[in-house]
Structures are given as C-alpha cells and as structure tokens.
C-alpha cells in the first residue's frame, strides 16, 4: 500500500432516508451510504487525497454494496473487513418539521461494533499523514476498546489524530458514559471537530467562544473546529 493522506476508522452503515409517501400513504425510504468516517474518506478522495478506510461490515447485500461505493469513490478498502457472523448496521433517518434529523439504529451486534484490534492490518497506517475517527465506535461492543487502541497506535507513529465527537446519545447506555469515554478520547486528539451542542455537552461556558476556550485549555488541541 502507498502511504495515504487520510486513514478513516469507524462505522460504515446504511442510512434509510425519507423521500416521500407511497401511493398507499406509507413512508418511502431511500437506501444511502452513511457513517461519518466513511463520508470523510470519500470527501477527501474527491478532493484528490489518497484515502483508506478501516472498518467492518456484514458480508451481506448492504455490506457488499457499501464496499463497492467506497471502491468507486477511490477509497482503499483493504482494511474493510467483511463478517459472515454479524450484519451491517442500519439507520433510519427521520426529519422533523424544521428539517432536523433524528436516527433509529439497528445495531445490536452490528458488524461495526464487533471490530477487534487484532483484525486490523496496521500496515494501512504506514506513512499516513492524518488519522480520523469519531465517538460512534466507542458506544458499545468490541469496537470501543479497538477505537482507543488504534488512536494510540496512530499517535505512537506520530500521526495527527482528528476526532469528530459526532454524538449520538441513543447509541449509548447513558449520557454520563458517553461523556466519560469521549473525554478519554479527547486526551488522544490533536484536531477536534465538534458541534455547538456537543461543545456545551463537554464544556460549560456562557457562549461558544468561552466554552471552546475552556475545552481547549484543558486538552491543548492543535486545532478546534466548531
């Protein structure tokens, strides 16, 4: 493998998004590729970067379709594992009257949650310029421990770690548990991407600037993006 500009680690799943109502009056959903880290890999590839994706999907119609989408998007999938035991994670997206999204996940024993560190071909990190991940893989299963181990591996190699909080509380046992593990991840983060809502979840402050300054003073990021 040639050295990659960006290696993304995390969830690759199917988003079923609403596209209207059928003739029978039932909601119609469209199957779309999803998963924040996979989206980053695809977007970076479109900009001309060399990218690779580390993850796990089911060896099913969804997982094979997702792998094909990454390949067509010029994302290296040598470190994307296909599981014969676990199924690809599915998410159904609902939009409220303001257009804001909410998610219903079908992820119990999903393939992405069962990714083990020893399954990953670490050669994908050789010469890598940036490593990207998010908190979704930390919510449950084997992938929680794997997330921290791969972040530490990247840092050991001198690779800057980019972390997207991407908080999905309905995937976690509790908000307190989510905050605990996300704060652990921040200790391994060089570049942080966080929404305003996530920022106030992690840091108190009268406004965004104050909350961001407090969080940055605690972890000393190279960059903090809100």
Language model features: what each stretch is:
Residues 1-76:
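Glycine-rich phosphate/adenosyl-contacting loop at the front of the ribokinase-like
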Residues 7-8, 130-132, 162, 193, ...:
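Structural motif
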Residues 165-171:
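A short, histidine- and acid-enriched strand-loop-helix "catalytic/donor-clamping" loop
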């Amino acid at each position: 493998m040639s050295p990659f500009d960006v290696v993304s680690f995390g969830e690759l799943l199917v988003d079923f998004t609403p596209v209207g109502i059928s003739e029978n009056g039932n909601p119609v959903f469209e199957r779309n590729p999803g998963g924040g880290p996979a989206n980053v890999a695809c977007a970076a590839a479109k900009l001309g970067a060399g990218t690779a994706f580390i993850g796990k999907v089911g060896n099913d119609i969804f997982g094979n379709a997702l792998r094909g989408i990454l390949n067509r998007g010029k994302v290296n999938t040598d470190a994307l594992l296909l599981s014969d035991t676990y199924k690809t994670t599915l998410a159904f997206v609902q939009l409220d009257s303001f257009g804001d999204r909410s998610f219903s996940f079908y992820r119990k024993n999903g393939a992405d949650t069962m990714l083990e560190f020893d399954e990953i071909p670490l050669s994908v990190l050789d010469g890598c310029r940036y490593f990207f991940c998010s908190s979704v893989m930390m919510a449950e299963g084997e992938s929680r421990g794997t997330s921290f181990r791969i972040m530490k591996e990247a840092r050991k190699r001198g690779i800057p770690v980019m972390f997207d909080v991407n908080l999905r509380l309905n995937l976690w046992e509790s908000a307190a548990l989510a905050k605990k593990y996300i704060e652990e991840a921040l200790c391994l983060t060089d570049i942080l991407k966080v929404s305003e809502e996530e920022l106030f979840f992690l840091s108190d402050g009268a406004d965004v600037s104050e909350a961001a300054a407090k969080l940055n003073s605690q972890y000393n990021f190279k960059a903090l993006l809100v």
